[in-house]
Amino acid sequence: MDRTAVVADGASKPAGPYSHAVRSGDLLFISGQGPFDNQGALVGTTFAEHLRSVFDNLAIIARAAGGDINDIVRLGAYLEDYSNFQEYNAFMGEYLRPPYPARTTIPVPTLGIPIELDAVIAMPPRATQPPTA
């Protein structure tokens, strides 16, 4: 099975030895994204600003791979403070178009950032290349 790493200019920089995303077949697996800019600085002070930053990072990575954030089939959410769930839920419903992805939301009080999201996106098939002689 082929695996292709995706590097997305403009998304938050990986904080360790991992890729923004990896494409395997027609699926794109996006690593956990926090509310950081491309220099690694925390974006915003409110939960709403953090939400926008995290979803924007997912969208940047999806586009860099040739995909679309609205093709997410699975979304994992990790919330430092679970009292933010309703705001997260409402924002997701506004940012993404139906049909909405399968989703898991887990409270992680020791996360150290307000929210982290990871995602799996269904990608358009790659163009088939003719065999070389």
Model features per residue range: what roles?
Residues M1-D56, I60-V73, L79-A133:
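N-terminal presequence-like segments and the immediate start of the first folded domain
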